[in-house]
A protein has these predicted regions:
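Contiguous, well-folded functional domains in the mature portion of proteins
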Residues: 2-187
Length: 187
């Protein structure tokens, strides 16, 4: 068993179709936290041109080791999809965050996905938002990479990429749920 397999078994939980318990982590203004456990990937390395180019905003990709997306900050749900593969939120300090699970997963029509929140819901950092079946995504021929993007960059005074870890897998850092990823300040 390799290091990545060992980490997967460490982080994997059973019964992900039911609402998982909330995670608990401290929050600070302007900070977007890792919404899932996994291996951090530079956005420019995500195999999707619109995402990799930064056209949609700045952020990270995360190769997930678990199948639940948690709120990366306090805020409210600003967008949902009927296919449950992506979600948008507006943080308490006005940051617009878009989380997308997988590439091409819209074609799955919601199979393998469950959403635990609705449009307009107020959420706390660490609250479960979406669960997804990584094996179903791969069986459908898609990648399960999760992208976390801050959009509407013209509203920002600054954005700093802080996602890092001392543990490297294939040269990329491992991130745990609740690790800081991005620090942004609005104008």
């Amino acid at each position: 068993m390799g290091l990545l397999d060992s980490l997967k078994s460490t982080f994997t939980s059973s019964g992900e179709a039911s609402v998982p318990p909330a995670a608990s982590f401290a929050t600070r203004e302007g900070v977007i936290y890792a919404p899932v456990n996994g291996v951090l990937v530079n956005l420019s390395e995500v195999p999707d041109e619109a995402i990799a180019s930064g056209m949609l905003g700045q952020g990270y990709g995360i190769e997930p080791i678990t199948g639940t997306i948690y709120a990366p900050a306090n805020g409210r749900i600003g967008a949902t999809t009927v296919t449950n593969h992506s979600i948008g939120m507006i943080t308490e300090d006005g940051l617009r965050v878009f989380i997308h699970v997988g590439l091409g997963t819209v074609e799955m029509n919601g199979k393998g996905f469950a959403r635990f929140v609705e449009m307009g819901d107020t959420v706390k950092a660490g609250q479960p938002l979406i669960s997804f079946d990584r094996e179903a995504i791969k069986a459908a021929g898609h990648e399960d990479i999760v992208t976390v993007i801050i959009s509407e960059l013209d509203r920002l005074k600054s954005i700093n990429h802080v996602g890092e870890s001392g543990t490297l897998i294939g040269g990329n850092p491992l991130v745990k749920l609740g690790d800081p990823l991005l620090v942004a300040k609005t104008k």
